[in-house]
Protein backbone atom coordinates (compact mmCIF):
# COMPACT_ATOMS: atom_id res chain seq x y z
CA UNK A 1 0.00 0.00 0.00
CA UNK A 2 2.86 2.35 0.79
CA UNK A 3 5.47 3.47 -1.71
CA UNK A 4 7.83 5.15 0.73
CA UNK A 5 7.93 7.33 3.85
CA UNK A 6 5.70 9.99 2.38
CA UNK A 7 4.41 8.48 -0.82
CA UNK A 8 1.87 5.83 -1.64
CA UNK A 9 0.96 3.59 -4.53
CA UNK A 10 -2.82 3.66 -4.82
CA UNK A 11 -4.50 0.40 -5.74
CA UNK A 12 -8.23 0.78 -6.21
CA UNK A 13 -9.39 -2.80 -6.47
CA UNK A 14 -10.82 -4.67 -3.48
CA UNK A 15 -9.29 -2.61 -0.69
CA UNK A 16 -11.17 -3.20 2.54
CA UNK A 17 -11.18 -1.61 6.00
CA UNK A 18 -9.20 -4.65 7.16
CA UNK A 19 -6.46 -3.86 4.64
CA UNK A 20 -6.21 -0.29 5.87
CA UNK A 21 -6.30 -1.45 9.49
CA UNK A 22 -3.40 -3.81 8.82
CA UNK A 23 -1.43 -0.86 7.43
CA UNK A 24 -2.43 1.20 10.49
CA UNK A 25 -1.25 -1.53 12.88
CA UNK A 26 2.12 -1.82 11.16
CA UNK A 27 2.75 1.92 11.28
CA UNK A 28 1.54 2.15 14.87
CA UNK A 29 3.76 -0.73 15.95
CA UNK A 30 6.80 0.97 14.43
CA UNK A 31 6.10 4.24 16.22
CA UNK A 32 5.53 2.49 19.55
CA UNK A 33 8.88 0.74 19.16
CA UNK A 34 10.61 4.05 18.44
CA UNK A 35 9.17 5.67 21.56
CA UNK A 36 9.66 2.71 23.92
CA UNK A 37 12.02 -0.21 23.39
CA UNK A 38 14.14 1.58 20.76
CA UNK A 39 13.95 5.00 22.38
CA UNK A 40 17.72 5.31 22.77
CA UNK A 41 18.22 4.89 19.03
CA UNK A 42 15.34 7.28 18.33
CA UNK A 43 16.73 9.87 20.75
CA UNK A 44 20.12 9.88 19.03
CA UNK A 45 18.60 10.29 15.58
CA UNK A 46 16.61 13.36 16.64
CA UNK A 47 19.58 15.71 16.46
CA UNK A 48 18.46 19.32 17.10
CA UNK A 49 21.24 20.50 14.78
CA UNK A 50 19.58 18.84 11.79
CA UNK A 51 16.73 20.17 9.69
CA UNK A 52 13.04 19.54 10.35
CA UNK A 53 12.71 15.82 10.96
CA UNK A 54 9.64 13.58 11.00
CA UNK A 55 8.96 10.27 12.70
CA UNK A 56 7.40 7.86 10.23
CA UNK A 57 5.82 4.55 11.16
CA UNK A 58 6.09 2.09 8.29
CA UNK A 59 3.61 -0.64 7.32
CA UNK A 60 6.14 -3.40 8.06
CA UNK A 61 6.30 -2.45 11.75
CA UNK A 62 9.51 -0.42 11.57
CA UNK A 63 10.11 3.32 11.89
CA UNK A 64 12.29 6.03 10.39
CA UNK A 65 13.36 9.53 11.36
CA UNK A 66 13.88 11.50 8.19
CA UNK A 67 13.06 14.67 6.28
CA UNK A 68 9.52 15.15 4.98
CA UNK A 69 8.62 14.10 1.45
CA UNK A 70 9.78 16.33 -1.38
CA UNK A 71 6.43 16.23 -3.17
CA UNK A 72 4.19 19.27 -2.72
CA UNK A 73 1.53 18.45 -1.83
CA UNK A 74 2.66 15.08 -0.45
CA UNK A 75 0.81 11.94 -1.48
CA UNK A 76 0.31 10.94 2.15
CA UNK A 77 -0.51 13.18 5.11
CA UNK A 78 2.74 14.23 6.76
CA UNK A 79 3.74 13.67 10.39
CA UNK A 80 4.49 16.67 12.59
CA UNK A 81 7.68 18.48 11.59
CA UNK A 82 10.62 19.42 13.75
CA UNK A 83 10.23 17.27 16.84
CA UNK A 84 14.03 17.09 16.95
CA UNK A 85 14.23 20.82 17.77
CA UNK A 86 12.40 20.34 21.07
CA UNK A 87 14.44 17.34 22.22
CA UNK A 88 16.85 19.18 24.52
CA UNK A 89 14.39 21.83 25.69
CA UNK A 90 11.87 19.52 27.35
CA UNK A 91 11.80 16.75 29.90
CA UNK A 92 12.24 13.50 27.99
CA UNK A 93 8.92 12.08 29.16
CA UNK A 94 7.06 15.21 28.04
CA UNK A 95 8.91 15.25 24.73
CA UNK A 96 8.05 11.64 23.97
CA UNK A 97 4.44 12.19 25.01
CA UNK A 98 4.15 15.16 22.66
CA UNK A 99 5.49 13.10 19.77
CA UNK A 100 3.09 10.31 20.69
CA UNK A 101 0.10 12.66 20.52
CA UNK A 102 1.13 13.96 17.10
CA UNK A 103 1.78 10.40 15.94
CA UNK A 104 -1.73 9.32 16.96
CA UNK A 105 -3.15 12.15 14.88
CA UNK A 106 -0.96 11.19 11.93
CA UNK A 107 -1.90 7.50 12.09
CA UNK A 108 -5.59 8.31 11.95
CA UNK A 109 -5.13 10.82 9.14
CA UNK A 110 -3.26 8.24 7.04
CA UNK A 111 -5.87 5.56 7.71
CA UNK A 112 -8.78 7.76 6.70
CA UNK A 113 -6.83 9.14 3.75
CA UNK A 114 -6.74 5.58 2.45
CA UNK A 115 -10.42 5.24 3.28
CA UNK A 116 -11.21 8.26 1.13
CA UNK A 117 -9.00 7.14 -1.74
CA UNK A 118 -10.51 3.67 -1.71
CA UNK A 119 -14.04 5.07 -1.66
CA UNK A 120 -15.17 3.70 1.70
CA UNK A 121 -18.84 4.25 2.38
CA UNK A 122 -20.31 5.15 5.77
CA UNK A 123 -20.34 1.56 7.05
CA UNK A 124 -16.76 0.93 5.93
CA UNK A 125 -15.57 4.15 7.59
CA UNK A 126 -17.36 3.24 10.81
CA UNK A 127 -15.80 -0.22 10.69
CA UNK A 128 -12.34 1.26 10.23
CA UNK A 129 -12.92 3.69 13.09
CA UNK A 130 -14.05 0.89 15.41
CA UNK A 131 -10.98 -1.19 14.59
CA UNK A 132 -8.51 1.65 15.10
CA UNK A 133 -10.28 2.64 18.33
CA UNK A 134 -9.95 -0.90 19.70
CA UNK A 135 -6.21 -0.38 20.24
CA UNK A 136 -4.63 1.87 22.89
CA UNK A 137 -3.31 5.11 21.48
CA UNK A 138 0.43 5.59 21.16
CA UNK A 139 0.13 8.29 23.81
CA UNK A 140 -1.55 5.86 26.22
CA UNK A 141 1.25 3.34 25.73
CA UNK A 142 4.07 5.88 26.03
CA UNK A 143 2.63 7.78 28.99
CA UNK A 144 1.66 4.65 30.90
CA UNK A 145 -2.03 5.38 30.63
CA UNK A 146 -2.70 1.79 29.59
CA UNK A 147 -3.00 -0.57 32.54
CA UNK A 148 -0.44 -3.03 31.23
CA UNK A 149 0.42 -4.84 34.42
CA UNK A 150 -2.24 -4.80 37.08
CA UNK A 151 -4.70 -6.81 35.00
CA UNK A 152 -2.92 -9.88 33.77
CA UNK A 153 -3.47 -13.31 32.36
CA UNK A 154 -3.73 -16.56 34.24
CA UNK A 155 -0.46 -17.70 35.73
CA UNK A 156 1.50 -20.75 34.63
CA UNK A 157 2.89 -23.72 36.50
CA UNK A 158 5.63 -21.36 37.72
CA UNK A 159 3.03 -19.38 39.63
CA UNK A 160 3.00 -20.76 43.16
CA UNK A 161 -0.55 -19.61 43.78
CA UNK A 162 -1.87 -20.67 40.39
CA UNK A 163 -3.67 -17.33 40.11
CA UNK A 164 -2.95 -14.09 38.30
CA UNK A 165 0.55 -12.60 38.59
CA UNK A 166 0.65 -9.91 41.29
CA UNK A 167 1.30 -6.28 40.46
CA UNK A 168 4.07 -6.26 43.05
CA UNK A 169 5.50 -9.70 43.78
CA UNK A 170 6.77 -10.78 47.16
CA UNK A 171 10.48 -10.35 47.70
CA UNK A 172 11.00 -14.12 47.69
CA UNK A 173 9.31 -14.67 44.34
CA UNK A 174 12.24 -13.70 42.15
CA UNK A 175 11.72 -15.77 39.00
CA UNK A 176 7.99 -15.96 39.50
CA UNK A 177 7.33 -12.52 38.05
CA UNK A 178 9.20 -13.23 34.85
CA UNK A 179 8.56 -16.86 34.09
CA UNK A 180 4.98 -17.07 35.24
CA UNK A 181 4.21 -14.06 33.14
CA UNK A 182 1.83 -15.10 30.44
CA UNK A 183 2.10 -18.83 30.05
CA UNK A 184 -1.48 -19.93 29.63
CA UNK A 185 -2.43 -22.93 31.67
CA UNK A 186 -6.19 -22.72 31.73
CA UNK A 187 -8.92 -21.45 29.47
CA UNK A 188 -9.29 -17.72 29.06
CA UNK A 189 -7.27 -15.62 26.71
CA UNK A 190 -8.37 -12.88 24.42
CA UNK A 191 -12.07 -12.40 24.96
CA UNK A 192 -14.44 -15.13 23.78
CA UNK A 193 -15.85 -15.72 27.24
CA UNK A 194 -12.47 -16.05 28.96
CA UNK A 195 -11.07 -13.93 31.72
CA UNK A 196 -12.06 -10.37 30.92
CA UNK A 197 -8.86 -9.04 32.45
CA UNK A 198 -6.71 -10.79 29.86
CA UNK A 199 -8.10 -8.73 27.01
CA UNK A 200 -6.90 -5.63 28.85
CA UNK A 201 -3.30 -6.79 29.23
CA UNK A 202 -1.33 -4.68 26.76
CA UNK A 203 2.31 -5.04 25.73
CA UNK A 204 4.28 -1.89 26.51
CA UNK A 205 6.30 -2.31 23.31
CA UNK A 206 3.92 -3.25 20.51
CA UNK A 207 0.63 -2.31 22.16
CA UNK A 208 -0.95 -5.66 21.34
CA UNK A 209 -3.14 -7.55 23.81
CA UNK A 210 -2.31 -10.85 25.46
CA UNK A 211 -3.02 -14.07 23.53
CA UNK A 212 -2.99 -17.68 24.69
CA UNK A 213 0.37 -19.35 25.28
CA UNK A 214 2.55 -16.25 25.01
CA UNK A 215 5.52 -15.59 27.28
CA UNK A 216 5.52 -12.11 28.79
CA UNK A 217 7.82 -10.36 31.25
CA UNK A 218 7.28 -7.42 33.60
CA UNK A 219 9.72 -4.55 34.17
CA UNK A 220 10.59 -4.18 37.86
CA UNK A 221 11.06 -0.42 37.44
CA UNK A 222 7.99 0.80 35.53
CA UNK A 223 5.91 -2.37 36.12
CA UNK A 224 4.95 -2.61 32.46
CA UNK A 225 4.37 -5.99 30.81
CA UNK A 226 6.06 -6.89 27.53
CA UNK A 227 5.99 -9.78 25.08
CA UNK A 228 9.21 -11.69 25.66
CA UNK A 229 9.86 -11.56 21.91
CA UNK A 230 9.45 -7.76 21.84
CA UNK A 231 12.25 -7.25 24.37
CA UNK A 232 14.26 -10.32 23.33
CA UNK A 233 13.83 -12.22 26.57
CA UNK A 234 13.19 -15.97 26.54
CA UNK A 235 11.83 -18.06 29.42
CA UNK A 236 15.31 -19.52 29.86
CA UNK A 237 16.88 -16.06 30.16
CA UNK A 238 14.16 -14.93 32.55
CA UNK A 239 15.06 -17.72 34.98
CA UNK A 240 18.42 -16.03 35.56
CA UNK A 241 17.18 -12.43 35.81
CA UNK A 242 16.89 -11.19 39.38
CA UNK A 243 15.44 -7.78 38.54
CA UNK A 244 14.31 -7.11 34.98
CA UNK A 245 14.67 -3.58 33.57
CA UNK A 246 12.98 -2.90 30.22
CA UNK A 247 14.97 -1.13 27.46
CA UNK A 248 13.16 2.15 28.08
CA UNK A 249 14.07 2.23 31.78
CA UNK A 250 17.63 1.06 31.08
CA UNK A 251 18.20 3.76 28.47
CA UNK A 252 16.64 6.47 30.63
CA UNK A 253 18.94 5.69 33.56
CA UNK A 254 21.97 5.59 31.27
CA UNK A 255 21.28 9.12 30.03
CA UNK A 256 20.68 10.39 33.55
Swiss-Prot record:
SUPFAM superfamilies: FYVE/PHD zinc finger (SSF57903). It is found in: Nucleus. Residues 154-164 have a biased composition (Low complexity). One of its GO terms (cellular component) is nucleus. Keywords: Chromatin regulator, Metal-binding, Nucleus, Transcription, Transcription regulation, Zinc, Zinc-finger. Pfam families: Alfin, PHD. The keyword Transcription regulation applies. SMART domains: PHD (SM00249). GO terms for molecular function: histone binding; transcription cis-regulatory region binding; transcription coregulator activity; zinc ion binding. A zinc finger (PHD-type) spans 200-252. One of its GO terms (biological process) is regulation of DNA-templated transcription. The PHD-type zinc finger mediates the binding to H3K4me3. Histone-binding component that specifically recognizes H3 tails trimethylated on 'Lys-4' (H3K4me3), which mark transcription start sites of virtually all active genes. Belongs to the Alfin family. This is PHD finger protein ALFIN-LIKE 4. It comes from Oryza sativa subsp. indica.
